Swiss-Prot record:
Keywords: Cytoplasm, GTP-binding, Nucleotide-binding, Protein biosynthesis. This is Peptide chain release factor 3. Gene3D superfamilies: P-loop containing nucleotide triphosphate hydrolases, Peptide chain release factor 3, domain III, Translation factors. GO terms for cellular component: cytosol. The keyword Transcription does not apply. Residues 10-279 form the tr-type G domain. Signal peptide: none annotated. It comes from Dichelobacter nodosus (strain VCS1703A). One of its GO terms (biological process) is regulation of translational termination. InterPro entries: EF-G-like_DII, EFG_III/V, G_TR_CS, P-loop_NTPase, PrfC, RF3_C, RF3_dom_3_sf, RF3_GTP-bd. It comes from the Bacteria.
């Protein structure tokens, strides 16, 4: 791919799309690929019998339900830049996967439903972005439907998300009366049109200059009021400030309709120019700059069985510095060993190509035979660890019941591989033979159950179990750890990394145990460092 893609790390634009479920994120992802030339025809995400399934929703359950369950990675060239788009789960049960994905991007695109405004999941994701001072573009979607007043939406974004809004495009009408959008910086009106059901690109008329007499002909009943509205907007609205955007303090706001392909191209063109190139990343030892010659990278996601024909596991690695070349040897810091990477991959969702080269900001896929974990750092020899890639204590627990006892080996293999992806965890109590699965949301159990059956030919069911919460255990010394284990064996388990975990039957039990053992650290999250 290197013959059509820029080889300069400064041309990389690596970002994630964040939104509440049903705000149109997966549809927008499709349309970005359409405008980027990565796909020729956009498939409707839900429903229509003749429509293709959305390119980024390749897992069977995602195709059936029309929700994004795992993060896909897609790369395409656009206006001289290389766009690396990480599609995150839209369903709240998969917030862990989304959180980790946000550690691998340099900016984010927030999608808001023009009728619903700022919703709960958007608020949570913005909190994560704020912690990392991630620059945010905003796309207010579904302009082809009746929604709230644009100014009201801007006010809500500023009030609820604590970020200034700088309108860049502004709608002329909405719903059935939608006529177009006006780009304030380009002083250009783009008239509303749609491709065939939104499946292909179809440009409407463009008029340069808000004072152009052509607008009086095309919009005789509303153009005077609209000119006044824009005059008012320029006076009271925030002008776009690039530095404030890069600091995560201000978001440029675009309006459009992803399903109609409208307003998307204007936003994507600006994004390619304004979004930041790869940024420095912190490690336990020092900060790594993208322009450094030697390659460094970290694994933020593992996906099992992306292709049932291959029965594979792919580790997704973000390149933070240097250049990856096919066949090069890398140092896997956690294991202290050198590994050869002969056949790394790049992605167009489930489509894969062998990567000959990759640069800072790019995401590559490495075949994983059980030795790579989320959070692993790869270098050309230097011992350092990238930080900030989290695991979360599960909120929900189920006991795994196997329907065919002869399938136990396949069950353990399947659970181990699916847990490697980080979306679910399983625990083996020190006493007894139970297998306990932990997750953030109920949907994760359904996904694991379906994937065990589809990918590993293992049928099982999940039963409720008397576990309220879990905490990773650390002790100041071996003596304190042994005392703790001796007195709490009934509530202790090992996770799939053989880390010791306290599984509490109730919140009260956890609190009392913490009070009885003040020297023991009970961690609700853990970093993937050197485990």
């Amino acid at each position: 791919m290197s013959d059509i893609l820029s080889q300069d790390w400064r041309d990389r634009r690596t970002f994630a799309i964040i939104s509440h479920p049903d705000a149109g994120k997966t549809t927008l992802t499709e349309k970005l690929l359409l405008f980027g030339g990565a796909i020729a025809l956009a498939g409707a995400v839900k429903g229509r019998k003749a429509a293709h399934h959305a390119t980024s929703d390749w897992m069977k359950m995602e195709q059936e339900r029309g929700i994004s369950v795992t993060s896909s990675v897609m790369q395409f060239p656009y206006h001289g830049k290389v766009i690396n788009l990480l599609d995150t789960p839209g369903h709240e049960d998969f917030s862990e996967d989304t959180y980790r994905t946000l550690t691998a991007v340099d900016s984010a695109l927030m999608v808001i439903d023009c009728a619903k405004g700022v919703e709960e999941r958007t608020i949570k994701l913005m909190e994560v972005c704020r912690l990392r001072t991630t620059p945010i573009f905003t796309f207010v979607n579904k302009l082809d439907r009746d929604g709230r007043e644009p100014m009201e939406i801007l006010d809500e974004i500023e009030r609820v998300l604590h970020i200034q809004c700088a309108p860049v495009t502004w709608p002329i009408g909405m719903g059935r009366s939608l006529k177009g959008i006006y780009h304030l910086a380009r002083d250009t009106v783009y008239f509303y049109t749609t491709g065939k059901g939104g499946a292909s690109i179809n440009h409407g008329e463009t008029v340069v200059g808000l004072d152009n007499p052509r607008l009086d002909t095309l919009l005789p009943d509303i153009i005077d009021d609209f000119r006044e509205e824009i005059h008012f907007l320029r006076e009271v609205g925030n002008p776009f400030d690039h530095e404030a955007y890069l600091r995560g303090e201000l978001t440029p706001v675009y309006f459009g309709s992803a399903i109609s392909n409208f307003g998307v191209e204007e936003m994507l063109t600006d994004f390619a120019q304004l979004a930041p190139p790869p940024r420095p990343h912190r490690t336990t030892e020092r900060e790594v700059a993208p322009q450094e010659e030697k390659l460094t990278g970290f694994v933020f996601k593992i996906q099992a069985n992306m292709d049932l024909k291959h029965r594979d596991r792919i580790a997704f690695m973000r390149v933070n510095s240097g250049t990856f070349r096919a066949g090069m040897k890398l140092w896997q810091v956690r294991l202290g060993r050198e590994v050869k990477i002969p056949d790394a991959l790049t992605f167009l969702a489930a489509e894969r190509e062998h990567a000959q080269e990759a640069f800072a900001g790019d995401i590559i896929g490495i075949h994983n035979h059980g030795t790579i974990r989320i959070g692993d750092t790869f270098t050309e020899g230097e011992s350092l660890q990238f930080t900030g890639i989290p695991d979360f204590a599960p909120e929900l627990f189920r006991r795994v019941q196997l329907k065919d006892p002869l399938k136990m080996k396949a069950l353990l293999k399947g659970l181990a591989q699916l847990c490697e992806e980080g979306a679910t965890q399983f625990f083996k109590p020190l006493i007894g033979s139970d297998l306990i699965l932990g997750a953030i949301g109920v949907l994760q159990f359904e996904v694991v159950q379906q994937r065990l059956e589809t990918e590993y030919n293992v049928k099982c069911q999940f039963e409720s179990v008397a576990v309220a919460t879990a905490r990773w255990i650390e002790a100041p010394n071996d003596k304190a750890l042994k005392q703790f284990i001796d007195k709490n064996q009934a509530n202790l388990a090992h996770d799939h990394y053989e880390q010791l975990v306290y599984i509490a039957p109730s919140r009260v039990n956890l609190q009392l145990t913490q009070e009885r053992f003040p020297d023991i650290v009970f961690s609700q999250t853990r970093d993937h460092l050197a485990q």
